[in-house]
Amino acid sequence: MESKETVRIGGRRSKLAVVQSEQVKVMIESKFSHIECPLLSVHTLGDQVQSKPLYSFGGKAVWTKELEDLLYKDDESRIDLIVHSLKDMPTLLPDGFELGGITKRVDPTDALVMPIGSPYSSLSELPDGSVVGTSSVRRSAQLKRKFPNLKFESIRGNIQTRLAKLDDPETPYKCIVLASAGLMRSGLDSRITQRFNADTMCYAVGQGALGIEIRKDDEKMKKILKEICDPSTTICCLAERSLLRTLEGGCSVPIGVVSNYDESTKVLTLKGIVINVEGTEWVEIEHKVTISNEREDSINCGKELAAKLTQNGAKEILDSINLDKIT
């Protein structure tokens, strides 16, 4: 029997990350019968340090560095690709690495989750001073804009840990906010009380999609990934990431997006919001382009929207954000 070719997949060790790695494994193995994909799960700094809010880390390498080191190992721990939640991938990767592909996006929205048995079904029903748990300043800033009567506090941990904290009878949280996609991929759709629409909350860049990181110029991996990645999602997410990169915002900065690509008209619509941490100042603009060259036009769309936002005060908002980061 002919031995199979091996493509080693790396990912974080959380339950959700393992599910995501397994999804990519299935995609590749179902397209290529001669390939098998063993999985390697790794604890990253972001997994290990649970006592600090995410914004204090200052950047996204907190989720990626340990895995990136394995792409260039010369022993049995070497991997060929890394599966990330795209929203956690830095928009500027270190030398020697590149974004090899983006999978089809599932629901990109943010979700409100109430404790089991809660009498409430929306933020507008909560009593003044109720505590909302979220690890994201993007979420808390946008919600403060709409619900200044509520309090927002950090909550860390994987999805199961956060849900356990929420459901604890002694919990300080009246509700928490999570990515809809993470709940769906974890089989926890039933915990979603409400999905926020774009009027209330723009989602994170890349949210709901998986980004696959590879060694730079690894043509073999590029050919494999081309077969499992989604063109429409790629167009939207390249534009979103270009916007974020041009504005120089990391995952710790309140920048939200909403994007849509119409395959029939080839029109890409990208909306961006830059908002201060307090939710009192913001700039929100929508931009449309017709796509002819998928990569080039998508990236330019993000750059053009970034320029519009900057012209309307986004830079001043971002410059005013002074967060206490880990040095």
Swiss-Prot record:
Q: Determine if Nucleotide-binding is one of this entry's keywords.
A: no
Q: Which UniProt keywords apply?
A: Heme biosynthesis, Porphyrin biosynthesis, Transferase
SUPFAM superfamilies found in the cross-reference section: Periplasmic binding protein-like II, Porphobilinogen deaminase (hydroxymethylbilane synthase), C-terminal domain
Molecular-function annotations in GO: hydroxymethylbilane synthase activity
Pathway membership, UniProt: Porphyrin-containing compound metabolism; protoporphyrin-IX biosynthesis; coproporphyrinogen-III from 5-aminolevulinate: step 2/4
Provide the GO biological process annotations.
protoporphyrinogen IX biosynthetic process
> What note does UniProt attach to the cofactor annotation?
Binds 1 dipyrromethane group covalently.
- Please report which protein family the annotation says this sequence is part of: Belongs to the HMBS family.
Protein name, please? Porphobilinogen deaminase
**Gene that encodes it:** HEM3
